[in-house]
Amino acid sequence: AVVRLKGEEVVCHVKNTGRCRELLVPGAPVFLEKSDNPNRKTQYDLIAVQKGNRLINMDSQIPNKVVEEWLLQGNLFGKDARVKREVSYGNSRFDLYIETEERKIFMEVKGVTLEENGVVRFPDAPTQRGVKHIKELCKCTKDGYEAYIMFVIQMEDVLYFEPNYATHPEFGNALSEAEKAGVHILAYTCQVRKDLINLAKPVRVYVNGKEESEEEQETVC
């Protein structure tokens, strides 16, 4: 991304693999982090962007760290839970592995930055890797593990989360099948400030899309 810094245009590395087209627009205020590596092609990393009243984290490495810290504080699985990063299962390596006296859990973490009118969606670009992870999580439930997908919404004050069927229907379909297979699907907002980021509040998840879910409810009634 090209950023105007102190009157000069500077090329910055964006620490996010998504498209981020709705965020990185001309004139958007951004936050940079200076690299201490003199051999890098770019001197700065673009780590956050302001969109309206929301400050949105752009560093794709942060969600895993935020969730790990949150779990180690005793959230979700208790204070005795042991948490490991990057543990392999089958043909995949999951972001987190959690173990308690009675439970063994794999968790995949996805950072969410795509927001429109308060609705947040994932992914913002097709992700076959994401589909593969979901299918592997379904397999591990058959071997006695618990499985979780945590969507970390890297902003505050949103309405609900749903898969981005318009961009990657296969991902949405895989997520829907995962829920049926017993995979737990969670979404949490983040409190994002200049000097911190924390998990904040749980958000309603519509794995089949909100409109589809409402139509199903009407049919049942």
Predicted regions and their residues:
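Short aromatic-glycine-enriched beta-strand elements
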Residues: 1-2
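A short acidic/basic microdomain associated with nuclease active sites
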Residues: 72-89
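Conserved catalytic cores of phosphodiester-cleaving nucleases, focusing on short active-site segments
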Residues: 94-124, 137
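Nucleic-acid nuclease catalytic cores
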Residues: 118-128, 138-167, 189
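Flexible glycine-rich surface loops and low-complexity tracts that mediate binding to linear polymers
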Residues: 25-37, 189-190
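OB-fold/S1-family single-stranded nucleic acid-binding modules
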Residues: 37-54, 200
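Short nucleic-acid-contacting surface segments enriched for D/E, G, S/T with interspersed K/R
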Residues: 17-31, 138
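Domain-level recognition of nuclease-like catalytic cores that cleave nucleotide substrates
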Residues: 155-221
